Swiss-Prot record:
GO terms for molecular function: G protein-coupled peptide receptor activity; G protein-coupled receptor activity. Glycans are attached at residues 18, 42, 248. One of its GO terms (biological process) is determination of adult lifespan. It comes from the Eukaryota. This is Probable G-protein coupled receptor Mth-like 7. Keywords: Cell membrane, Disulfide bond, G-protein coupled receptor, Glycoprotein, Membrane, Receptor, Signal, Transducer, Transmembrane, Transmembrane helix. Gene3D superfamilies: 2.30.160.11, Methuselah ectodomain, domain 2 (2.170.180.11), Rhodopsin 7-helix transmembrane proteins (1.20.1070.10). It comes from Drosophila melanogaster. The lineage of its organism: Eukaryota, Metazoa, Ecdysozoa, Arthropoda, Hexapoda. GO terms for cellular component: membrane; plasma membrane.
Length: 491
């Protein structure tokens, strides 16, 4: 009877051992760096010329964010580098991150050229420390990041005594003041990072820092839904290209819209999986180009549908599709080119950072948090969505008018009086029109800043899931209908 008990205890021990996280004792997660790509030498690891003993390393199976949330990731080795040297966090754009986790933005060369330093005070000790003698942790940008000039806090710091700071830990001293940057009162160490283009001015008398205001996560299951959506996109395109009667102007516009949305979804997935190293910026501009193109195609489809249904001439001339192409691709190119020029001109100017589109900084796409998104994304999208709603309303009114006329004529012929009656096919037709004409995309215009309210937060979540499944909805409404299957059988 003892052997089964021993086996049971052994199995439990293995389970708890495998599921436990090998945290480094006495080390904060934000004081660690990923050293999975560094080989072990003489019972230590060499990280940026800093020798870290193996006793200060451990395996982690999670990633911790500034808001305290944890995401499971692949098991990797981390080292408590801040136990060896004082640390400073400097932001690194997504476009400069390499596959091994290093940042290739020329920071080392700039530090060697300008030789910047900061003053540290801990308890009663003060020291002037060059940044080249510190452990530099390259921090990433997040969705709600905000650029802050450090002198904005000086007036507040003057009211706080030095004794309060000394109890709290690290202080950054300037020649004409002091600024606390670590724990407990203003910002935790994970809530900020220094801006890269800081050291050619009057640093450290003043500096620009990036404040991480929030951490966003991809909604559970949305990545899987996007993959299924892309499969449905491919199937829908194949059906529209296979059936000759669907290769009219409307069908071609739908195919172009789906292709644009497919490329946008593909870049989004690759960006989330960190597979765009080396091509982050080109991928980000391409994503914006095809995002705006798909929105423009929805407006073209809305206009063309209204034009065809309300026109006595139902013939679709080929030149009309060529005009649509010229309008969509040129407009999308102008929109993308404008944000490219803005980024190139003011990318290194911290004072204008908050208003930049920041392609390749937060992710490989245009940022979507700040009033400036109304210039680059939300404003144009709202205008196009409003146009789509207007076209749908005019089309629906026309269909209702025609249906009412037909019902009235039928009732007069049969000698009876009846109210206008819409059957299920009519409602299904309205549903298809609302989807094809992009009626629902107006909810996607809600900025993330407005989603801090609980109601708009839920509207945003529902909209995100629905539009992640947009390809599935299109496939069901356009391909799985009876008329499409009949055309497929006849082809």
């Amino acid at each position: 009877m003892r052997l089964p008990w021993v086996i049971f205890c052994t199995v439990l021990l293995l389970i708890f051992t495998n599921n436990s996280n090998a945290d480094i004792p006495g080390c904060n997660y934000y004081d660690t760096v990923d050293i999975s790509y560094i080989e072990r030498q003489n019972d230590s690891y060499l990280y940026d010329d800093i020798e870290i003993p193996a006793s200060l390393t451990g395996y982690y199976e999670f990633r911790q964010f500034g808001d305290g949330s944890i995401t499971p990731i692949e098991k990797h080795l981390r080292a408590c580098v801040c136990s060896v040297r004082p640390c400073i966090r400097i932001c690194c754009p997504a476009k400069n991150f390499l596959a091994n986790g290093k940042c290739d933005d020329g920071l080392k060369e700039e530090l060697a050229r300008f030789k910047p330093y900061i003053y540290f005070t801990y308890m009663d000790l003060q020291a002037r420390v060059p940044l080249t003698d510190m452990a530099i942790i390259r921090d990433e940008f997040f969705d709600c990041d905000e650029m802050i000039y450090i002198s904005d806090f000086n007036y507040f710091l003057e009211e706080v005594s030095i004794q309060i700071f000394n109890k709290c830990g690290l202080i950054v001293w300037f020649q004409d003041g002091k600024f606390w940057v670590t724990v407990d009162l203003f910002m935790e160490k994970q809530d900020y990072c220094l801006y890269r283009h800081n050291f050619d001015s009057d640093f450290p008398k003043s500096m620009w820092i990036i404040r991480h205001r929030c951490t966003s996560h991809i909604s559970p299951g949305s990545l899987e839904i996007l993959i299924i959506t892309m499969i449905c996109f491919v199937l829908t395109i194949a059906v529209y290209l296979y059936i000759k009667k669907l290769r009219n102007v409307t069908g071609k516009c739908i195919v172009c819209c789906i292709v644009s949305r497919f490329i946008q979804c593909l870049i989004m997935i690759l960006d989330h999986l960190n597979l765009l190293n080396g091509i982050c910026s080109p991928a980000g501009y391409s994503s914006h180009f095809f995002r705006m193109a798909s929105n423009l195609w929805l407006s073209v489809i809305s206009y063309h549908t209204w034009k065809v249904l309300t026109s006595l001439n139902r013939v679709d001339p080929n030149y009309r599709f060529l005009r649509y192409n010229a309008f969509v691709w040129s407009t999308a190119a102008i929109m993308t080119g404008s944000i490219y020029i803005v980024n190139q001109i003011w990318e290194n100017d911290p004072s204008k950072w908050n208003w930049l589109p920041l392609v390749g900084f937060i992710r490989c796409s245009v940022k979507d948090w700040h009033p400036s998104v109304w210039i680059y994304i939300s404003g144009p999208s709202l205008a196009l969505s409003t146009f789509n709603v207007a076209m749908f309303a005019l089309t629906a009114i026309y269909i209702r008018k025609v249906k009412g006329g037909i019902n009235k004529f039928t009732n007069e012929e049969e000698g009876r009086i009846n109210c206008i009656n819409f059957d299920s096919q009519t409602y299904l037709q309205f549903l298809r029109l609302s989807i094809v004409m992009g009626l629902t995309w107006i909810f996607n215009v809600i900025p993330y800043s407005a989603r801090l309210h609980i109601f708009w937060e839920w509207v945003g979540i529902i909209s995100e899931y629905f539009h992640s499944a947009f390809g599935i909805v299109l496939f069901v409404l356009l391909v799985l209908k009876r008329s499409t299957w009949t055309l497929m059988m006849d082809s």
